[in-house]
Amino acid sequence: SYAALRRGMSGDEDFHAIPRLSLAAAAGPGQFAGGEAPFDNFGFSGRWLRENGFDPKMLSALTVEGDSMEPLLRHGDEILVDRGSRFERDGVHVVRMGDALMVKRLASAGAGRIALLSQNLAYPPVEVSLDEVEVLGRVVWKSGRL
């Protein structure tokens, strides 16, 4: 009920301000990064962050641009990136290739290689050397319009 929801928002719980960065991670061919200055914050429950093992100092929010990760991530979705989680296992990550930031599903592709995979099958996989890409963090949460 609404009353129960309001009781859960009593202010007794700690919240952490997670910076929303003024750059986008492209779900497409790649977006040139502008700067990494926060323009706003998302408030996340400290309890939720602890339950999920997240360090608030290692989290940033970015906006998804493009359609290559649809239907998982849509253009305009906000994503939470755990910068403390590098590529240790397959999953959705934010990567930098040159000046471009991209959000892609990563998979091992043999010794010293990595595959950048789109959810949208209209985009073919891209295989690169680990030296060509910097894994900035793992996508751990998303928010978007219905």
Segments from the language model and where they lie:
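Short, surface-exposed secondary-structure edge patches
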Residues: S68-L72, D82-R86, L130
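Short coil-to-beta-strand transition motifs
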Residues: R96-M102, E132-E134
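Glycine- and charge-enriched low-complexity intrinsically disordered segments
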Residues: S108-L146
